[in-house]
Amino acid sequence: MSEALKILNNIRTLRAQARECTLETLEEMLEKLEVVVNERREEESAAAAEVEERTRKLQQYREMLIADGIDPNELLNSMAAAKSGTKAKRAARPAKYSYVDENGETKTWTGQGRTPAVIKKAMEEQGKQLEDFLIKE
């Protein structure tokens, strides 16, 4: 709250300030204050009327949905599911190649991404082909 509003809100300070003004000035200030208060009341009532109208419309639409056999919660849930925007996770690709790493563990590779170092080394140094690592079904 600003200093001017604090002065207007405090009756003692207001009386002290009013002693320095003429009666005509005080009446003019009162008229202006009444105009401002009336404008504010009109704004508040207009805002309340808008909220009431919106609530009435929402209730009307809700009744229309129920009349058509649609549960409003079902509609909200379907809208939320469509709006979520999260992508569905892809299914993991099946392993296509199998190899034994330096620790003696059998590992698999889908064929996507970088070629594992063990397979790359075997292809370069031992002359193996990628088909040599295929998992036979």
Swiss-Prot record:
GO terms for molecular function: bent DNA binding; DNA binding; DNA-binding transcription repressor activity; identical protein binding; minor groove of adenine-thymine-rich DNA binding; protein dimerization activity; structural constituent of chromatin; transcription cis-regulatory region binding. Belongs to the histone-like protein H-NS family. This is DNA-binding protein H-NS. SUPFAM superfamilies: H-NS histone-like proteins. Residues 2-64 are annotated as: Responsible for protein oligomerization. Signal peptide: none annotated. Changing residue 114 to A: Considerably reduced DNA-binding, in fragment 91-137. Disruption phenotype: Loss of osmotic regulation of the proU locus, loss of changes in plasmid linking number. 2X decreased growth rate, which is partially restored by a mutation preventing expression of SPI2, increased expression of about half of the genes to which H-NS binds. Note strain LT2 has point mutation in rpoS which decreases its translation efficiency, in the presence of wild-type rpoS, deletion of hns is lethal. Leads to the expression of genes encoding virulence proteins in normally non-inducing conditions. It comes from Salmonella typhimurium (strain LT2 / SGSC1412 / ATCC 700720). It comes from the Bacteria. GO terms for cellular component: cytosol; nucleoid; protein-DNA complex. SMART domains: HNS (SM00528). Changing residue 12 to H: No longer binds Hha or YdgT, slightly altered DNA-binding, may self associate into longer than wild-type filaments. Derepression. It holds the Pfam family Histone_HNS_N. Composed of 2 domains (approximately residues 1-64 and 89-136) joined by a flexible linker. The isolated N-terminus (1-64) forms a trimer, probably via coiled-coil interactions. The isolated N-terminus plus linker fragment (residues 1-89) forms homooligomers of increasing size with increasing protein concentration, while the isolated C-terminus fragment is a monomer. A shorter fragment (residues 1-46) interacts with Hha. Residues 112-117 bind DNA. Acts as a global transcriptional repressor and binds to the minor groove of AT-rich DNA. Silences genes by altering DNA topology; in magnesium concentrations equivalent to inside Salmonella-containing vacuoles (SCV) it forms rigid and elongated filaments on the DNA, and in higher magnesium conditions it causes DNA bridging/folding. Transmembrane segments: none annotated. Residues 22-55 form a coiled coil. Keywords: Coiled coil, Cytoplasm, DNA-binding, Repressor, Transcription, Transcription regulation.
